[in-house]
Amino acid sequence: MVVRYSLLMKVSFAILIFLVGCNENATSSNDQYLTDPDISEQTKKPSRPIIDEKNKGVTDTSVTIEWDKIECEKNFSHYNVIVYRKDRIEDVITIRTRNNSVFIDDLKPNSQYSIDVSSCLHSACSESAKIEFITLNEIDYYHTTEIEKNVYGSLEGEVRFVQTHVISPEGRKNEPEIITGRDALILFKPSIKNSSSILMKIYSEDGLTSKVVMKSPSMLPKTDQPIDIDENNKVVSYSNSYWSAEIPWNKMKSGMSLHFEDENGNLGIIESERIKFSAPSELIIQNIDLGMLYKPRGRNIVIKELERTAVDYFQKVPVSKLIFSDYTPIHFEKITLPNGTVYTEKSADIGGWHQGDMREAVGKALVSTGINNANLGIVASSGYSQQYNRLTNHITAHTNIGYYNNGVVVHGGSGGGGIVTLENTLHNEWSHELGHNYGLGHYVAGGTSHGPDTSWGWDGYYKRFIANFDWKRSPQSNIRPDNQEVVKPFMDKYTYLWDAMSGGYDHQNGIISRYTLHHPYVARIIQDWLKNGAVVINNDYMVWDELKNIYVYKGTNFKVPIKKGVPVVTILGVYDPDKINPSQLYPPTYSNYGNIFDLEKPRSESSLKGWQYVKDVNYLDRVNTHWHTMLVNRKEEKICRFSYLSPKGKKFEFLGYEDIENKICTGGRSIHYLEDGKKNPIESKYNDYFLLSIDGDGEISYVPDSTIGESKICSLKMSGTVYGAGFIKGNSCRQIDGVFMNGFQWAFTLNQSGVNSTYTWSNECVLKIKDKDNNIESISIPNYRIEKNQSNKIHLNISREKPIIDINVYCGEHELTSIKVSDNPDIKLLKGPIIVGQEHGYTSYEPKLPSGWFKHYDNFEPKNEINHELGKMRVNDNDEYICRFNFSDSDREMKFVGYVSQLSESKYICTGGSEIYYKKNEINIELSSKENDFEWLSVRDKNLVGSKIEFDNNKTLCVLDNRSFYGAGYLDENNRCTQDRQIHWSNGKQWLFSTYKTMTYH
């Protein structure tokens, strides 16, 4: 119970004891004390509480404090808590509780308070533990006293779910729905503010699953507001009214209901029918850096910081699981376009951010579309095709630079159809171009600006709210293009953000996020697009059924991978089955996350070729060989050939169809040979004929008789009872004179529908891959141009289990192109896959190093998996690790900050390099540590995120960021970046700069 009173007034009050603490033992001793107190216990004093500063929460109007709990000391009674304002000591709040924490509301903003806490037995109390605090001078963004009631009972109120956005549970059209299988923060605001503690119970369809003690409003998570805000701006909090608790991903599913219970037994419930769940969507984004006739730039920040960017972008998209993967970069030193053009030095085209023939044919069609197709088991497509064969939510983003007729050009700024072409993989370019892939156009709904009626975002890793306005931009109104609606700045201080598709913002707005917070209406459109994507479960493609809230089987013609999300080699190239355009295979690219399929093997490995005498064809030959057929009475029948001898001795070669049941080649009931007015059936002797395989080389022909000579074959593909095959003579497809069908000579003009006049051997095309053990894997690829005016492109994944050494493309007996494959050192630099969400949580981004400065230790190496945690500075054109060591002069010792230089394997020094030195008595002294005797700098600490990193002794670390100079130091009293006064640059001047950047934890 909380009592407020003036020392000048006498106030009587009832004492409320919270029965949370020592349970039955404590209760028993209390009962005993009421009738027969233990005299020895009456004189004993309990131990003094120890207040936990880390668990203190302060807002403008409330505070929560916590202290060490007394573990059921005999005759323990309660804690006394006394709160008073320093400038008005007559305003006192007294609380008597058995909880080891307390929430106090209705305090005065920007005021100094003191709290005394003592623990009491029935007879005596301990000395008080004291803590002082100042309530914040902050702005409560969600300050409205009105609530949207959706929790009913004696503890009614409002509940909101927080995932990518703060949303209502009912599922509104203008905001995302709750994501199944994703962690959530629950916010609860009681209608009446009289609760000191609230317990949240989580129920599923099977009953109670867990209980969570909610954090008081003063413990509500912080925002992404920069720490070094202007002194004229106050701290902004999301709200000072909501209780909060987290629910893990595996409890977030349909059928969940929530019960809220306070210390007085009041109960509020939101039933499962009022909580609308959407699909547990998954999203895969592949990332690759390209250079076309020019070396790749190596500036793809997503690839460099895969863990950080994956976790960051996860906060912006309504998915349950996000997978970021990286490919090894590709340097295209020679390029063959699908039209046959070959470049070895530069493109003949004019390149631009949005234009260039290589940009379209290589970056978008070959690489992004190719990688997407390879992960669906599609081995080839037409060379210029950018068709998005969307089944799963799989997108490939690339950065790309090319050498064109007008010089070296960086491409970027486009997205859609599973493709993203970027110059900058951070900020709004990424968010905007990915948005096009989700079906979003420019200026959704006429231009979407955040405003006072749109929700904030949430970062589940840093556990901070993301504001929907710009923290640093000067205040101004946003005006919607379509209806001129004006959105004024929040409190006339902060400009509201535009959605990514309406301009967004090209800077890091707060202290944690480098991607754009989508407007909730736009986020809902994204969610609706994503939930239609299939996932692979138990060797089947499955899609989410919103009515049943489960995954159900999806029928599709796409292959299901035999291995999902495994290391792969992706083979890309261009080939022309017609052997007109040149073909080219490119150096393979590698990823740690791709799909492997049981790809079609070439028929030629087990298939017979050409005309085959039926007695020589066994069962396996029949099964493994692809045979030419013709249409007979709407049924495909195998074409066959035999030597026919008429009753009067006329001999010719006849093309018919195989009657497999009777093992003859026949013309059937409708075709006969007319001789002397008599109709003679045309059929072979038993098992004495030839079948025609699809495989072979060149055009297919036969000799009807010696007078006609060798002729190309033709056949009919007509509905009804008209059928047959023959030879081409002049402008007709015909048989030997005398062969009739339905009373007419068997002859048809070539140009009419249903006459197939082009028969060629298949000339099968095969991709052959040889591994280091000389094993060869052969994969069938199309033996025809998919589009008649261009070459095909190859895109397929194979396993990385064994290194490959050769790749060849054959069509028939002709080798079209080949490439020898050498070891790729970039494979060791791959970081992916980074999987965020569901059971993976944020484990891929948890720090592996201590925070701040730490001593070098044995076997420490700045390996690929931790180098993103280490602070870096620019030295000439390289990013070098920041380090610090103690430098001793004869009369003093100081800290020097330099960069790490590797001497040999596992041996490092911290140095100032050749340009920075210590000057004493006109002598330049080199600045270098002893071997492995220095400190590294870790810049990862989510609890200190946004805080400036110290140089030493409360001095702020600063780093130069230009090409002319390098180094790091601290900010002096004049806000200049410097080190000790005797540290100089090579030009003889003191190392002292007014242009620099400060470093913060992330």
From Swiss-Prot:
Its EC number is 3.4.24.-. Disulfide bonds: none annotated. PROSITE patterns: FN3, PEPTIDASE_M66, PROKAR_LIPOPROTEIN. One of its GO terms (cellular component) is plasma membrane. Residues 31-53 are annotated as: Disordered. Residues 282-536 form the Peptidase M66 domain. Residues 45-139 form the Fibronectin type-III domain. Zn(2+) binds at H432, H436, H442. Its main location: membrane. It is a lipid-anchor. Binds 1 zinc ion per subunit. Keywords: Cell membrane, Hydrolase, Lipoprotein, Membrane, Metal-binding, Metalloprotease, Palmitate, Protease, Signal, Zinc. The active site is at E433. Pfam families: fn3, Peptidase_M66, TagA. A lipid is attached at C22 (S-diacylglycerol cysteine). It is found in: Cell membrane. Residues 1-21 form the signal peptide. It is an enzyme of class 3 (hydrolase). Its cofactor is Zn(2+). GO terms for molecular function: metal ion binding; metalloendopeptidase activity. It comes from the Bacteria. A lipid is attached at C22 (N-palmitoyl cysteine). GO terms for biological process: proteolysis. This is ToxR-activated gene A lipoprotein. It comes from Vibrio cholerae serotype O1 (strain ATCC 39315 / El Tor Inaba N16961).
